Amino acid sequence: MTHLKFELARDLPTLEIDNRTLYRIRALRSGAVGGFVECESNLSQTGDSWIGDDAMVYGGAQVSGDAQVSGSAQVSGDAQVSGDARVSDNAQVSGNALVCGGSWVCGGAQVSGNARIGDNARIGDNARAYGDAQVYDDAQVYGAAR
């Protein structure tokens, strides 16, 4: 039997973005209110993954494993955030991008296209990783780097 960890909080105000309706999530055990998703498949019901604060995950995007999305971060398109990855602040992950491992995307950073961020890499400030970019192995990309 699968134990669900969250539900769509349909009793709370929704958010409209890109002609999509996003719903707040609510933890079933604690009742804590989290961020926004378009549908239940945006956040895995297994593991400790979570979407908090005013973060938004929509489209075909997925958050799984023990990944955390927080602040006002956005994950969209078919992007995936998995493992112990963190996406926070005003960061954006979109397209077919993958953020995994113990990686962090924070500040106003943007990861898009087919970019891959993994193995404890850090992308922050207003840095951009796009196209087929790959950032791995504890690499750190900050400032206005592209």
Model-predicted segments: where are they?
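Terminal amphipathic alpha-helical/low-complexity segments used for targeting or macromolecular assembly
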Residues: 1-48, 54, 72, 114
